[in-house]
């Protein structure tokens, strides 16, 4: 690992030198480009496209294209790309990951490679983490693209198929990772070619790439339908589990996040449930419910893993601390938590289509990403995605000071020291941001600060609605902010305050309508009322800018923002994200982590050395400890967890790659059926396969004809073919010979001829046009149904295959063999079902309204999750946080537009 790190640093320095040469080439063009008129600048797009069509590679067009975008940005947005932003743009164009620190202007960087690659006409996808950022960036950066004659699209929640098609047809498309993934799945469930929305997956630029490709790597997007399973058993198990004793009846492994019944526990549960043998296959479902109830009670903690809000169990994102509205744990775990908390249980769902972010984004021809923290995961990006990480230098030197960890014997002593440190800094007026890893810890600290009389703000999943407001104020004089996991918070902390936010706050005070305020700081087309609001906003912004600039200088004199981490996260990257909240754009700042020897990280992964050290040290709880062993143990523990998590993700990917290959094959064949004009050759091939498989099953090669199963073949032909029942005598009559003289080829040809005659008769009865439509719809429905069943079967295989290790077999190899057999059986089942139903299907007049409703329902559906959760979109409450991610209440954000669209 250390060798990899050294090589990475050396390679990065060499890479930056190469990038500097490209920056020089762009800068040399700047004086000439600056002299161009607007019309001459706009003429650059068709000129560059002509060069591209003439065979010039994109790399040759890069210097001029980048210089053009830089100049247009300066004219329309008054923002000129810095040299380091040009570097970042080159890295993204090369299909790599650009690590750029917070505040370095990643949004503007993306315009450079997006413009260059959009010249191909194939569409560039810019992927953000929520609807709010996608909408903001598409409108804001859209000025650059529109000036240059390119169109922009927006893919967010709530659009119908026609709106999505229009957006995907654009040159540059902004959207969220969830929506891009769901559209891929929905396209592969479409019943008509006109319902397809996505073009081919050409080039994606992923913002916060570490969050999407690592933190959510194991998160599948799932489109689901409700299953018919009853919910009573969950309540039964929720009442049973509290009667069990930890260690006596079940064992909890916090490190592996597992819980299992002991022998004594099995006996106790059998007694309580009045079951003879809980391990018996007939009680498999009961045992599954029991295990999920144990997980819900012993592993899942309220206000850490989830919160209960408005009678619902809502997952808390372990990486960002945000509430994950609409996401649900799969496999019955969410229902088990609902039963534990005594809220209404929602039914389990059945998977209709699924894909992980890992596999979705690996389908792009070219993939690139941006983030503030990627270098610690460079090895994983390279091994799993084939993506190199380049650390781009900052525009101004980084002068933030990262202080050594303060280590305490106990958590209580640590929190007392944190409060003292906050009090001392607050007394001088220096703003302080405190990062905690759970809602529970943030509220403990908040109570301690309240007792000390220190005014402060709390930002955690419970106070999501105030998020933007709290973050915007965190850099002001005397501000104290407690935040659960600042990763991905999306709003810059500006020293002295954010003038844009203050201007909008003043407009709220003046009673401007919420929908007008929402548009005041935007850039898109608008009404006269909004145009007037934008004029007022600009005036207020200029006024507050003077105030915040003066306050900025005072905060700088105090040392900038001081950040306290109250616990080390499992991943160094998340710690670095917290640190990265200060020291933006050359501002001063300092960070320090306060750590206790009984924090989860050290307790679970620190090893026996820490336990022994705790016993040996007879020190005051409130005194910080400094010991080289502790610092080393911290780093070792984090590396150990990172390596473990990487291994888990790699292991999961090995299994997921198996089903991914099957998915690609089935979706490719499905698309051929969907878009095929004449499916007769496909049906003919299916009939040949059905005949061949039947003969193989009932008249196996190498077996004497007198031993063949003629009765079985006759019954099977009766199932497939319309009309009379087939008997062995019919076979003899049609072939003109006795059964002992049959050859396998005779039987195959007879069966195939009978199917072809039935097919021809069916087409003559219905007409060629109707027959083609029936073939297409029937095949698509059968493929979808069989694929759905196959996904369920693969899930069950994956759950049980690990036990093969006890038999000295490699579970992955066994999984590959069995899944291949299952896939072959599914294909055979699709062929058989299609042929059989084609001869029997009844034709009814098309129900246009129903068909349209099904399509609309599909676009309202969707899902993704944590580990394997399922999202099912529901009606959003007017006082709930807006699903777009803006942090505002739904009624004050997107409600009016949604109601207008619905009406």
UniProtKB/Swiss-Prot annotation:
Keywords: ATP-binding, Cell membrane, Cytoplasm, Membrane, Metal-binding, Nucleotide-binding, Protein transport, Translocase, Translocation, Transport, Zinc. HAMAP family: SecA. Its cofactor is Zn(2+). GO terms for cellular component: cell envelope Sec protein transport complex; cytosol; plasma membrane. May bind 1 zinc ion per subunit. One of its GO terms (molecular function) is protein-exporting ATPase activity. Belongs to the SecA family. It is found in: Cell membrane; Cytoplasm. The gene is secA. Monomer and homodimer. Part of the essential Sec protein translocation apparatus which comprises SecA, SecYEG and auxiliary proteins SecDF. Other proteins may also be involved. The keyword Kinase does not apply. It catalyses: ATP + H2O + cellular proteinSide 1 = ADP + phosphate + cellular proteinSide 2. The keyword Amino-acid biosynthesis does not apply. Residues 863-890 are annotated as: Disordered. Transmembrane segments: none annotated. It comes from Desulforudis audaxviator (strain MP104C). ATP binds at residues 85, 103-107, 492. GO terms for biological process: intracellular protein transmembrane transport; protein import; protein targeting; protein transport by the Sec complex. This is Protein translocase subunit SecA. Part of the Sec protein translocase complex. Interacts with the SecYEG preprotein conducting channel. Has a central role in coupling the hydrolysis of ATP to the transfer of proteins into and across the cell membrane, serving as an ATP-driven molecular motor driving the stepwise translocation of polypeptide chains across the membrane. Zn(2+) binds at residues 882, 884, 893-894. Its EC number is 7.4.2.8. InterPro entries: Helicase_ATP-bd, P-loop_NTPase, SEC_C_motif, SecA, SecA_CS, SecA_DEAD, SecA_motor_DEAD, SecA_preprotein_X-link_dom. PANTHER family: CHLOROPLAST PROTEIN-TRANSPORTING ATPASE, SECA INNER MEMBRANE COMPONENT OF SEC PROTEIN SECRETION SYSTEM. It is a peripheral membrane protein.
